[in-house]
A protein has these predicted regions:
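Short pre-active-site segment immediately N-terminal to redox-active cysteine/selenocysteine motifs
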Residues: 1-5
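Structural microenvironment flanking redox-active thiols in thiol-disulfide oxidoreductases
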Residues: 6-56, 67-74
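Residue-level signal for beta-strand positions within conserved beta-sheet cores that form or flank
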Residues: 26, 59, 135
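Hydrophobic pocket-lining residues within nucleotide cofactor-binding pockets
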Residues: 35, 77, 98
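Short, internal strand/loop/helix patches
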Residues: 50-93
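Thiol-/selenol-based redox modules, centered on thioredoxin-like
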Residues: 85-145
C-alpha cells in the first residue's frame, strides 16, 4: 500500500529496498503482494505497480497482484507491511512486523529490533527463527470482502 505511512517509512528510508537487495543477493525470492481491492486505498494494477517499483527503486523478485485477496487471506495478512518468510522446504518460518517499533517515523528504524532481517538470516543459516511470530504494524489491508 504505497499510500500507507508505515510502508512509506520503510521505502522512504531505503530500508525495504536494502532488505530486498540483501535477501535476493542471498538467493531469496522476495515477493511483494498487493492485496488491496480495486477502488480501495493501496490498490495497484500492473502498470501502477511497475511505476511504484521504479519510483521507489524497489528490488523484489516479483510483484503479485491479488485484487481478490486470495493470497492475503490465505496468510491472514492484516496490515501492510505484514512480512512472511517461507523456508526452502515451503514452511512458514516467520510472520509479523518488519521491526519492533510500530511507528511511521524513519528515525525509529535504526533503534528497532529488525525482526524480518533477523528471521531471514536465521533461515538462511539453517537455524530456527528465535521470534517466529511478532506483532505486525501498519495500515489495514483493504480487502474486497
Amino acid at each position: 500500500n504505497a499510500e500507507c505511512p508505515y510502508v512509506g517509512k520503510h521505502y522512504g528510508a531505503d530500508n525495504m529496498q536494502k532488505l530486498q537487495r540483501e535477501a535476493t543477493a542471498a538467493g531469496v525470492v522476495w515477493l511483494s503482494v498487493i492485496s488491496s481491492a480495486p477502488g480501495e486505498q493501496g490498490y495497484a494494477d500492473a502498470k501502477e505497480a511497475e511505476r511504484l517499483n521504479a519510483e521507489r527503486k524497489a528490488a523484489p523478485s516479483a510483484v503479485l497482484l491479488d485484487p481478490e485477496g486470495k493470497l492475503g487471506h490465505l496468510y491472514d495478512a492484516r496490515v501492510t507491511p505484514h512480512m512472511f518468510v517461507i523456508g526452502p522446504d515451503g514452511t512458514l518460518r516467520y510472520m509479523g512486523g518488519i521491526d519492533s517499533i510500530p511507528s511511521a517515523r524513519a528515525a525509529d528504524i535504526d533503534k528497532a529490533e529488525p525482526y524480518l532481517r533477523n528471521a531471514l538470516h536465521q533461515v538462511l543459516d539453517g537455524q530456527p527463527v528465535e521470534k517466529a511470530v511478532t506483532r505486525p504494524y501498519g495500515c489495514t489491508v483493504k480487502y474486497a470482502s
